[in-house]
Amino acid sequence: MRIIAGKYKRRKLFTPKGIQTRPSTDRLRETLMAILEGGRFGFPLNSNLIIDVFAGTGALGIEAASRGHPNKVIFIEKNSNAVKIIEENIKITKSNELFEILNIDLSQITTWKFEKAGLVFLDPPYFSDLVEKALIKLKEIDAILPDAIIVAEVSIREKNKFIKNFRILFSKKLGKS
């Protein structure tokens, strides 16, 4: 797995051994970034703050930072082994000051000490019902801008849930996602 484009292009990302995480494939990230860079939804890769929840390897947040110009990317990941992988992947960017890792379950965050995010990636374990819970929590702690773009990766067998104050702008099937 590698960074596909931008200032960190071709840098190899570390991935965990075993199946505790399900890293987003290069194909999925490339398609997703093309959609986000296309202008149809503004230019969310240039948001001041990008949040990558259920961050796993950090690939989505790092790819977004590679292509855009955020002031900060925050990874939220409760698994300590995954956090170690994210730390290694941040080191390869040589831009440590751009990234921050919160080693905590999103549901445990009670206050948000950062500015509001314009782009959020949600990539929870499949069939966990965590997308809806994460959206509610992010809104509750006031972590997202009213017009933030939320990108959620779910299994094609999971139903899209329409959540109050959120609407689906775009949906695309890629492999099993």
Annotate each language-model stretch with its function.
Residues 1-177:
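Class I S-adenosyl-L-methionine-dependent methyltransferase catalytic core
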